[in-house]
């Protein structure tokens, strides 16, 4: 298998009257992974992570249900396994983007539908990047370190992962807004849970006490928002997938 990457860098020009050039050297990327798999092995929700490049270092913040998945009951419905919206909240902090994207590309590789990751990058200053890093460091302070590998560390956070939030998308946007406050300002216009949630989940949520949020919480909806980018101009776009 080979990995195909497509890239489109959007250049911006400085004002002709600008005397001193202060160029942002750091980068923030929102990584949006598609659903993958089919049938009982389908993972329907997609994934979102934050990738920071600053001072020659890489930080990928990857929050998900990577621990124990917990069954969730909604009236007459009980969702468990891959369809459950709840699980232990695990934060994986990667130090290598190539290692992260290699693992993402493997998701669903043996099924009829593998993962595609869409990356939307923004040039930011080091001080902005550090605001994002500090956001995650504060989460880590009260967490339990559960694994340390060559390319990432795993932390069990005090909060569960839940489909309506906190989840990979809501946490990624909360972190991103530390550096780019206007991110997802008009995100509510792109919320469309019917497009993403499987039928069982839709019925379960309708029978529950939960109301669908009016903020972005599903990766696929976030991807629609970032494609249009009504609030913040995207500087760098990349797509990652396995080439069959």
Q: What are the functions of these language-model segments?
A:
Residues 2-24:
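N-terminal low-complexity, Pro/Thr/Ser-rich intrinsically disordered segments
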Residues 4, 31-33, 229:
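Low-complexity, intrinsically disordered/propeptide-like segments
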Residues 7-14, 134-244:
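Activation targets extended, charge/polar-rich intrinsically disordered C-terminal tails
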Residues 21-121:
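Glycine-rich catalytic cores of cysteine/serine-nucleophile enzymes that process amide/ester linkages
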Residues 38, 42-45, 90-94, 122-132, ...:
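Solvent-exposed, acidic/flexible segments
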Residues 52, 70, 87-93, 111-115, ...:
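Short linear sequence motifs
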Residues 100-157:
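Acidic low-complexity segments
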């Amino acid at each position: 298998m080979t990995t195909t990457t497509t890239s489109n860098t959007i250049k911006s020009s400085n004002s002709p009257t600008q005397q001193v050039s202060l160029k942002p050297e750091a980068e923030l990327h929102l990584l949006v992974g598609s659903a993958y798999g089919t049938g009982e092995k389908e993972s329907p929700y997609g994934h979102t992570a934050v990738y920071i490049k600053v001072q020659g270092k890489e930080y990928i913040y990857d929050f998900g249900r990577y621990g124990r998945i917990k069954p969730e009951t909604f009236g007459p419905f009980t969702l468990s396994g891959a369809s459950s919206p709840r699980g232990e909240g695990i934060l994986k902090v990667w130090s290598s983007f190539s290692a992260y994207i290699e693992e993402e590309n493997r998701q669903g590789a043996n099924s009829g539908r593998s993962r595609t990751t869409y990356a939307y990058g923004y040039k930011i200053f080091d001080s902005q990047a550090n605001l994002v890093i500090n956001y995650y460091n504060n989460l880590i302070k009260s967490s339990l370190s559960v694994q340390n590998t060559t390319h990432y560390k795993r932390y069990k956070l005090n909060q569960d992962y839940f489909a309506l939030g906190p989840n990979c998308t809501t946490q990624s946007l909360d972190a991103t807004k530390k550096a780019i406050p206007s991110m997802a300002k008009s995100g509510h216009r792109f919320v469309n849970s019917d497009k993403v949630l499987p039928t069982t989940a839709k019925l379960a949520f309708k029978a529950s006490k939960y109301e669908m949020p009016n903020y972005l919480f599903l990766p696929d909806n976030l991807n629609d928002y970032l494609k249009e980018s009504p609030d913040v101009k995207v500087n760098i776009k990349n797509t990652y997938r396995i080439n069959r």
